[in-house]
A protein has these predicted regions:
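Charge-dense, low-complexity intrinsically disordered segments
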Residues: 19, 23, 59, 63-66, ...
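Catalytic core of the metallo-beta-lactamase
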Residues: 1-31, 35-38
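C-terminal regulatory/interaction regions
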Residues: 78-129
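Divalent-metal (often Zn2+) His-rich catalytic cores of metallo-beta-lactamase-fold enzymes
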Residues: 28-82
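Broad hydrophobic/π-residue packing in well-ordered secondary structure
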Residues: 5, 29, 45, 68, ...
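Feature marks short, surface-exposed loop/turn motifs that line or immediately flank catalytic pockets
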Residues: 13, 53, 97
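Membrane-targeting and insertion segments and their boundary/processing signals
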Residues: 3-7, 46-50, 93
Length: 129
């Protein structure tokens, strides 16, 4: 069988959405996600979640993860360009992603640490200032 052992780079699943958690580069993370999606996994072992079973479940996961990566990137850019502080941007992301299962198993301190790296990466890679 085609089993993919994922890392947080491919998203942290909260039961409804795959939150992007990227520490090295947002563009690089998006490329990794697209490559992993193209593998046609039948099972994915997700950090902080467990196993997703079935080709269709895996396809849906990657579809959702790609959507959430794009949503996060676009909103961080928009919020930054409108003058919102990094702290406030991180709080908006917390409200969207640190809920449900993720809120129960993913320590808040880790979420703040990781998004505290990711938000400036997005701004650096996509914003002119």
């Amino acid at each position: 069988s085609k089993t993919l052992f994922s890392s947080e780079t491919l998203g942290v699943y909260n039961g409804t959405a795959a939150a992007p958690i990227l520490l090295t580069g947002f563009k690089q993370g998006e490329q990794s996600l697209k490559k992993a999606a193209a593998l046609g996994a039948e099972h994915i072992v997700l950090p902080h979640w467990g196993m997703l079973d079935g080709t269709e479940e895996c396809r849906k996961y990657f579809e959702n993860a790609l959507y959430e990566f794009e949503w996060t990137k676009n909103h961080v850019i928009d919020w930054h360009n409108s003058g919102m502080s990094d702290h406030d941007i991180i709080e908006e992301l917390r409200k969207r992603y640190h809920i449900g299962h993720m809120g129960a198993v993913y320590p808040m301190k880790a979420f703040y640490l990781n998004t505290g790296y990711m938000v400036p990466l997005i701004i650096k890679e996509y914003c002119a200032d």
